[in-house]
A protein has these predicted regions:
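Residues that scaffold the ATP/ADP-binding catalytic core of kinase and kinase-like folds
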Residues: 14, 104, 141, 202, ...
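Conserved N-terminal subdomain of the carbohydrate kinase-like
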Residues: 50-133, 316-322
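Acidic, amphipathic alpha-helical patches
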Residues: 121, 182, 250
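Conserved beta-alpha-beta core of the PfkB/ribokinase-like small-molecule kinase fold
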Residues: 130, 136-213, 220, 230-231
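Conserved phosphate-binding/catalytic region of the ribokinase-like
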Residues: 2-5, 152, 208-322
Length: 322
């Protein structure tokens, strides 16, 4: 199976030992390796695919822990660099009674921000099918140009470029700066994944259909929208599918969207969907992919932290997905 390559932040999430209280009230935390791009390729690898992470950590215990966790998940960490210029980033998380999150980030700057375009070479894209990235590392640091270089190389190889903005406003000087960076990179993406609460912020459109048409006009070939408890939807220029959410007990929503898009990308690569065939996916195919990813994400939210399930675990929970 060809590879899904993700570039972006690596950090430690400190997840709370209790739910239903504000971040300032949390009394103890548990260390969990995190970063949305890493969660995505962990999902791909845990499902039996081939995931590659491109990033940088500090020469510290937290960086070593992240690399260990990724390797244990089957992720190729050959392109995870180490630096003494900065420490590995940290994020402290609180959970309300429904499992939704509040973040406090410590990365001023963090090691991933110093990943340079010179560290991104053509060999990275060997046997690559998809390049995935988010917006957290699109700040005005060397890592932004590293993203540009990775996208350029992926384009040269005809890979699918996937962008999940994964908006994290506390990391930006202003919402306007965040929006501008996202919109700068939207034209690079063949597949865009948005949550329903990001849709208007990112696109300026009030409805999914309007957002889809706007993105298609800019070159996007597939839009995925996650709606939280209301399910998910997929749009191509010629097809549409939607699915209701699965009702499960929610422990923690951390990594839910990452597990959704990671399992979706796994299916695209498994089925050898290419840049040319992506916009031609039919309603039935889109629906099957949504069913699979909804099931996979439902397992993630039942666990604390972004812990990705294996394919046998998914099929044991939902045999109809086999």
């Amino acid at each position: 199976m060809k590879r899904v390559i993700a570039i972006g932040e690596l950090l430690i999430d400190f997840v709370p030992g209790e739910k239903g209280c504000a971040l300032r009230e949390v009394s103890h935390f548990e260390r969990v390796a995190g970063g949305a791009p890493a969660n995505v390729v962990s999902a791909v690898s845990r499902l039996g695919g081939s995931g590659v992470m491109v990033s940088q950590v500090g020469e510290d215990a937290f960086g070593e822990h992240i690399i260990d966790v990724l390797q244990n998940n089957g992720v190729d960490t050959s392109w995870v660099y180490k630096t003494r210029r900065a420490n590995t980033g940290l994020a402290f998380v609180s959970l309300d009674s429904t499992g939704n999150r509040e973040f406090s980030f410590f990365r001023n700057p963090s090691a991933d921000l110093f990943l340079s375009p010179e560290q991104i070479t053509p060999e990275l894209m060997a046997d690559g099918a998809v390049l995935h990235f988010c917006s957290v590392d699109l700040v005005d640091q060397p890592v932004k140009q590293a993203h540009r270089r990775a996208i350029e190389l992926a384009r040269e190889r005809g890979m699918i470029v996937c962008f999940d903005p994964n908006v994290r406003l506390p990391l930006w000087d202003s919402p306007a700066d965040c929006r501008a960076a996202i919109r700068e990179f939207l034209p690079c993406a063949d597949l865009v994944k948005l949550s329903d609460d990001e849709l208007e912020f990112v696109t300026g459109c009030r409805t999914e259909r309007e957002a889809a048409e706007q993105l298609f006009a800019g070159g996007c070939k597939l839009l995925l929208v996650t709606r939280g408890a209301e399910g998910s939807a997929a749009y191509t220029p010629g097809a549409f599918a939607e699915r209701a959410a699965l009702r499960v007990p929610v422990a923690d929503t951390t990594g839910c969207g990452d597990s959704f898009i990671g399992s979706f990308l796994y299916q695209l690569v498994r089925d050898r969907v290419t840049l040319e065939t992506l916009p031609a996916l039919a309603e039935a195919e889109l629906g099957r992919y949504l069913d699979f990813s909804a099931g996979y994400a439902s397992l993630t939210v039942q666990r604390k932290g972004a812990v990705m399930a294996t394919l046998p675990e998914l099929l044991a929970a939902y045999p109809a997905l086999a």
